[in-house]
Design a protein with these regions (language model features):
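Short, surface-exposed loop or secondary-structure junction motifs
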Residues: 2-182
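Glycine-rich phosphate/pyrophosphate-binding beta-alpha loops
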Residues: 111-118, 188-196
Length: 196
């Protein structure tokens, strides 16, 4: 979508989102973090690949996956390029090292809408409040009702082979709550918990 938008408007997705949605609604929400906002962002701490789990990887490799917890089985697959998880996260190699790559200036500045939007809780709440109430506020149109309905309806469900067979559900463009990923009691709630 980003390339199509750039060819039609001459703007990147981050620029377009800022001009048409974030600034008019007063949101501190960026797709590609501007240099002047770096001081407002804290580092993400990679929990799943803590130093302890990293030290355990050689031992984990010797244990059958059926005997491992989900996180440990994912850690085992993550380091094996022959698995779907390992293949996805090694293209390029995505190390959960300190410094953690998503904390780098290059990552934060990159415009990757599915992976590195930066915001604060107030702005995310305001944006999702608008989506939960029809998609428009103060004459600013974010999404139409039909698109929001498609986001709420399950379009895929099952084991996510990239995320270590975690059961997930997705609508169009958004994750939905599932057995392992809670989004509250409303089955139509949509979004993503994020990484930080």
């Amino acid at each position: 979508i980003g390339e199509i938008l750039r060819r039609v408007t001459g703007e990147t997705l981050g620029q377009y989102f800022s001009r048409k949605i974030a600034k008019p609604l007063g949101l501190e929400f960026y797709i590609g973090l501007p240099d002047e906002k770096f001081e407002n962002v804290t580092d993400i701490q990679p929990i799943i690949f803590s130093k302890f789990i990293k030290m355990m990887v050689p031992l984990i490799q010797a244990i059958p996956k059926s005997l491992l917890t989900h996180d440990l089985a994912f850690a085992k697959d993550f380091k094996n390029p022959q698995t779907i998880s390992g293949s996805a996260f090694s293209n390029p190699d995505f190390e959960f090292e300190i410094p953690f790559r998503p904390n780098s200036k290059q990552w934060r500045k990159a415009e990757i809408p599915a992976a590195n939007g930066h915001s604060d809780a107030r702005s995310i709440s305001k944006l999702y409040g608008i989506l939960a109430n029809g998609g428009s506020r103060d004459g600013i149109h974010v999404l139409d009702k039909k698109t929001i309905e498609q986001a709420r309806q399950t379009s895929s469900e099952g084991k996510d082979l990239v995320l270590g067979n975690l059961n997930t559900r997705f609508g169009h463009g958004f994750m939905l709550g599932s057995k392992h990923i809670s989004m509250g009691p409303n089955r139509e709630a949509f979004g993503h918990g994020g990484a930080g």
